[in-house]
A protein has these predicted regions:
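Short, glycine/charge-rich flexible loops or terminal/linker lids adjacent to PRPP-binding catalytic cores
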Residues: 1-46, 56-61
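PRPP-dependent phosphoribosyltransferase catalytic core
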Residues: 2-14, 64-182
């Protein structure tokens, strides 16, 4: 009852050549330092919540901002916690708890970022696209090489094909439903 909730809107943004990326504020939201200062302004204990904590790209970006603003993190709660994520929280000094613990997870995939026309990671552009469109990339073949290091060529091809087929099936189901309604 005596709590405040505030979402931190982050986005993984690739450079135009896809060589590197950074964690930034989601388009049309306040810059990350401002979002963290907003949380600090409530002067309440902070509990960070996410669906999964593995390599901690986002929390690595947020940790220095939380420290700069003297925003204490009382707890990190996640659905899935991996051994790598647990070790990172230990390094940062954040208490962490998860519903499921996956100590030896080597790779993870976020399906929504792999499906063309459904999701993806943002690609930096100097000009904005019309209609609120976001330039994005799906890290699958043929758009870009998958960024998963221990994956051989055949496995990358099979993963890419699976993502393309799933995206097609989802879009066909949506089209069928739309045509049935209209």
């Amino acid at each position: 009852p005596n709590t405040v909730t505030k979402t931190l809107r982050t986005d993984k943004v690739y450079e135009a050549d896809l060589s590197t990326y950074s964690i930034e504020a989601y388009p049309d939201y306040s810059p990350l330092p401002d979002q963290v200062r907003t949380i600090r302004a409530f002067d309440r204990p902070v509990i960070l919540v996410d669906d999964m904590l593995h390599d901690g790209k986002r929390i690595r970006r947020l940790a220095p901002l939380l420290e700069e603003t003297h925003t204490p993190v009382d707890q990190v709660l996640v659905g899935y916690l991996t051994g790598v994520g647990r070790d990172l929280m230990e390094q940062l000094g954040y208490p962490v708890d998860g519903i499921y613990y996956l100590p030896n997870l080597r790779m993870r995939f976020v399906e929504s970022t792999l499906y063309p026309f459904i999701g993806g990671d943002t690609v930096r552009r100097t000009e904005r696209l019309p209609g609120g469109l976001q330039p994005s990339v799906n890290r699958i073949l043929p758009y870009a090489a998958p960024e998963f290091a221990p994956m051989d060529g055949r496995t990358a091809w099979e993963l890419s094909l699976c993502c393309l087929e799933n995206a097609r099936d989802i879009l066909l189901a949506l089209e069928t439903e739309f045509r049935g309604l209209y």
